[in-house]
């Protein structure tokens, strides 16, 4: 069997035999969710995570003939201080792995050339107000982090939607 399901209370987890199967399974579930949301709304907003753990999922998702022109794509997190063309930038990862491949209605990167981190945060909060997130495609890190929300800075009642954080390994990010 390639996929095993386990359930604990309301949580359903699917364990896949390979990363390829996992990516395809997640993409199918994502495509179904996207189609359902687009039955309810004219346009939707999707927040994408950037990490090698997303490779198989992003590749499989592109195979679906979805109305991408009704979807606004948003970028979850970014390092501070990298050049615009730096391969380590998560925006560049997303551009390479999905954003450039599909005709999204719009793409919103968490980066403004020459802007201060604080101005980038303010701008992206405005983007999120205009495009409130309908669905997020992400993973959960080994230490429990989601994006750059490491456990020591993840405050669910935080008044800021976007902020600069200092990671446990001392690198600044937004």
Where are these predicted regions, by residue range?
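Generic structural signal for well-ordered alpha-helical scaffold segments
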Residues: 27-35, 58, 62, 95-99, ...
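Conserved small/polar residues in nucleotide/adenosyl-binding loops
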Residues: 173
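Short, surface-exposed, charged loop/turn segments at secondary-structure junctions
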Residues: 143-165
